Amino acid sequence: MPYVDRQNRICGFLDIEEHENSGKFLRRYFILDTQANCLLWYMDNPQNLAMGAGAVGALQLTYISKVSIATPKQKPKTPFCFVINALSQRYFLQANDQKDMKDWVEALNQASKITVPKGGGLPMTTEVLKSLAAPPALEKKPQVAYKTEIIGGVVVHTPISQNGGDGQEGSEPGSHTILRRSQSYIPTSGCRASTGPPLIKSGYCVKQGNVRKSWKRRFFALDDFTICYFKCEQDREPLRTIFLKDVLKTHECLVKSGDLLMRDNLFEIITSSRTFYVQADSPEDMHSWIKEIGAAVQALKCHPRETSFSRSISLTRPGSSSLSSGPNSILCRGRPPLEEKKALCKAPSVASSWQPWTPVPQAGEKLLPPGDTSEDSLFTPRPGEGSAPGVLPSSRIRHRSEPQHPKEKPFMFNLDDENIRTSDV
């Protein structure tokens, strides 16, 4: 949305066609300066550009003959498009929405009206000649895209190619002013995978640094728990993450001093450890960020445990199913439900009451003689268990070092049995 800055100029982002009938639109920052009688467009907001960076295009308002909404025949696949007719050329521009387009058309038509001054015409002619000589000087200065890095405490500007090494765009003069792809151009589809919570709001803003207090354009992303900002939309790892639980207040920055004084659409995110100053592209965008961040913080304060509760449920459900698939289930297969319950109840007490390397025999007990066990097996069935009816084959076998448990009958043979041997007695 266009807005009026502190110098009473109409400003905002628009997409302009690089060459007429090419169908390729590039995002630029436009300034309608009625005092200088010209329409200027930059690679980005001049406050975010390097010192001395000029406009990449200019158009005198006196050359504009008509500004109108583009017909579907002219641009059938470009919504919210309007055209500026000037010097036998047509400049096609695309706005963000219908209201944005109407505001720009009305402002340009109002600014390009021809008015006859009441005073002499000679001073006005001199001013027009001076203003006409200014745009060629701006066009002579080459515009090169670059990235800014701090290496060893020194600011280093490195030229970069924006189209992947095919050479700099805009090196060939077209039908009108040379245009280059801007770093502020926002692609429609990002490469960063959304692995976390769904995003509530995302977009580019300008943020003040913490150490050098420099202003840099960053891609911000807001979800239910954090505010992250990235160097560009394609990055996967954020430069910093601000947790919403640490955010104390978010509001428009009204008390300004120093460098903040010249910043429009500025709001601040106050945390317990630091205050973040963020500049949006328009007042509507600023109020939208403030509203969404405040709503997310309030929702987190009202329902802080919903997420942790849902996670605990999801972790408990797989664990409960794993109990049935554990080692104990192998021992209990083929048993009736009652016997399975008994085995589950008795197994912990039996297994935990003895360790094979520390046998502690009770008083009055005698260990099984070594001759009664086979030399090839370390485990020996308890006396009477092998032939006793009702005992399952899957019962636990006693280790040779385990003390024998006391029995109700200390003597396991029946003395009245005729088949008993005298050697057994």
From Swiss-Prot:
GO biological process: positive regulation of cell-matrix adhesion
Modified residues (Phosphoserine): 184, 314, 349
UniProt keyword annotations, A-Z: Cell membrane, Cytoplasm, Isopeptide bond, Lipid-binding, Membrane, Nucleus, Phosphoprotein, Repeat, Ubl conjugation
Every PH domain range: 7-113, 198-298
Record GO cellular component, one term: plasma membrane
Expression across tissues: Highly expressed in heart, kidney, spleen and peripheral blood leukocytes. Detected at lower levels in brain, skeletal muscle, colon, thymus, liver, small intestine, placenta and lung.
Biased composition (Low complexity): 312-330
Membrane found in the keyword field: yes
Complex formation: Binds MPDZ and PTPN13.
Role played: Binds specifically to phosphatidylinositol 3,4-diphosphate (PtdIns3,4P2), but not to other phosphoinositides. May recruit other proteins to the plasma membrane.
Name this protein carries in UniProt: Pleckstrin homology domain-containing family A member 2
Encoding gene (name): PLEKHA2
